[in-house]
Amino acid sequence: PFVAGPPSDGQKRFLRALFEAANEQQKFLHDGVRSGDMVRAVKAVFARHGLSEYDVYPPMHGIGLAEAESPYPDTESDYFLRSGMCVNSDISLFGHPDGSNRIEEGFVITEKGPESLTPLIRELVVKGI
């Protein structure tokens, strides 16, 4: 996520919600987790912050040759994440008065949790604003 210049208080609140959702998602990026459960957890963070109307895309998609390829889960998805899957976390909000922003990270799903393919982004998300 980026802001040109110093962030306003509204932009800070907005970014904190994105960071919170990205960090919450980490709890679900494990072998055997139902993909819809992960989507609902991310959406719950946005709902707590009153940001649901700006959440327009699923929070994860596959890594490959096309944009937003499978897996592309929604709240009703019942397939499981499996070790060895490579996914992009795509935590994003669009059309908010304080701006639109996205945190996109790559991960390999493992039995112990997500292995980051983008460690600098992961470090910045954990650090927050």
Residue ranges and their predicted role:
Residues 1-129:
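Active-site neighborhoods and metal-handling regions in enzymes and metal-associated proteins
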